[in-house]
Amino acid sequence: SATGLYSRATGRNAEAAGTASFATGYGVVADQDNSMSIGQFNALQTEGALFIVGNGADANMRSNAFEVHSSGNAVIHGDAVVEGTVFAGPYDVASTLGSLVSTVDSLQTVIAELQTQLEALTGGE
């Protein structure tokens, strides 16, 4: 049912309660103003959410798979599988992480060598 002003609801037991909200799916509720909820049995009262994909089991076990908030943050509840390159600004995340791990490994080797030299100079004390 669509109880919010300028709202629409489609599907089975879907409810659009927020102003200018839209809900479609099974047991979904769009309870935030200017929001859209799809899927099934999304979590209720998700503050600041504009877009929600619900993946709950039933009305007593509500949960979200994905959320986009008015702050610009996106929240994935579960693993994110990426087929392609992930960039953070201009940086290829996987390449940068690999480079950092390699640098840390090199530094650990240097530290171990320096520790050995220090022990030799101090007589192991």
What are these regions (language model features)?
Residues 9, 13, 109, 116-118:
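Positively charged, low-complexity intrinsically disordered regions
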Residues 114-125:
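Short, low-complexity, Pro/Ser/Thr/Gly-rich segments in the mature regions of secreted, periplasmic
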